[in-house]
Amino acid sequence: MPRKGPAPKRPLHADPVYSSPLVTQLVNKVLVDGKRSLAERIVYAALEGCRDKTGTDPVVTLKRALDNVKPTLEVRSRRVGGATYQVPIEVRAGRSTTLALRWLVTYSRQRREKTMVERLMNELLDASNGLGASVKKREDTHKMAESNKAFAHYRW
């Protein structure tokens, strides 16, 4: 651990189109090999597709999708006396948003649609409706935490 304390969090600037820091975070998650303009094109096209399909503000759709994907509990490994236990722990707000965005992008990359724009758009729409692989991942994470509730007293 550094002696000067934890590194300060850099401020996240809102994106120029939707004025939302969430969209900036999504662009950063889609970003590969530093190709920011390509990532922005993908995200903006996916959000426009969401607007066309639902007729609502795409940032609202993104927030609804994130609310359906954000985990409240996760398990962390804790070694006690030679045995490793999966200890359920509450997830901080920032981490839950980061995990939700990571899962959305990861599972949209695994989808079968032809372009990344279609994959991301359909994963966002599915997640906002409570469907999709990213929502299933959250449910699996909660199920894992629920089944290991007996080890909650090992929390740190």
Swiss-Prot record:
The gene for this chain is rpsG
A Pfam family found in this protein is Ribosomal_S7
Q: Which family does it belong to?
A: Belongs to the universal ribosomal protein uS7 family.
Protein name per Swiss-Prot or TrEMBL: Small ribosomal subunit protein uS7
Task: Tell me the InterPro entries matching this sequence.
Answer: Ribosomal_uS7 (IPR000235), Ribosomal_uS7_bac/org-type (IPR005717), Ribosomal_uS7_CS (IPR020606), Ribosomal_uS7_dom (IPR023798), Ribosomal_uS7_dom_sf (IPR036823)
Q: Which PROSITE patterns match?
A: RIBOSOMAL_S7
Share what the entry says about its subunit structure, partners included.
Part of the 30S ribosomal subunit. Contacts proteins S9 and S11.
Q: What does this protein do?
A: One of the primary rRNA binding proteins, it binds directly to 16S rRNA where it nucleates assembly of the head domain of the 30S subunit. Is located at the subunit interface close to the decoding center, probably blocks exit of the E-site tRNA.
**A GO biological process held by the record:** translation
Keywords, ordered alphabetically: Ribonucleoprotein, Ribosomal protein, RNA-binding, rRNA-binding, tRNA-binding
